[in-house]
Regions:
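Metal-dependent phosphohydrolase cores
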Residues: 1-133
Length: 133
């Protein structure tokens, strides 16, 4: 079994040993446009990519450009790790640690730093508000 995934742009990315130099916005956008929310348990195909457009909600609330971009990136780790249903994910602490580490790396790459505690709270509010939109 391979230790890496070949991304849309042809890079060999190791999800267990992520390298920020191999993270490409094109890979994130492409993969998230093809991953279905809710493990496919939705009435019609609804991609993670469509869900992250909750950035519109951040803009409507008058949040900063940084928070709008954070909304676009908040599920970016799923392009490398897939989407694990929340009830199951709660039972996988090591997965959560790896996902958080990768997401932190993505935020640092595209935002310049990780999210502050206040920004994380704002993001969760928007994510929950847009859960089914």
């Amino acid at each position: 079994m391979s230790e890496y995934i070949t991304t849309y742009t042809g890079l060999h990315f190791r999800p267990t040993e992520p390298d920020s130099d191999l993270i490409r916005i094109q890979d994130i956008a492409h993969a998230l446009s093809l991953i279905c929310r809710g493990n496919g348990h939705v009435q019609t195909f609804w991609s993670v990519g469509e869900h992250i457009c909750c950035a519109k909600e951040a803009a409507a609330r008058g949040f900063s450009e940084r928070m709008i971009l954070a909304c676009l990136l908040h599920d970016a780790s799923e392009c490398y790790l897939s989407d694990v249903p929340a009830p199951f994910k709660k039972e996988l602490p090591e997965y959560q640690e790896r996902e958080n580490r990768l997401l932190s790396m993505i935020y640092k790459k595209f935002l310049g730093s990780d999210l502050s505690e206040e920004e994380q709270i704002q993001l969760k509010e928007i994510d929950r508000a847009m859960l089914w939109y």
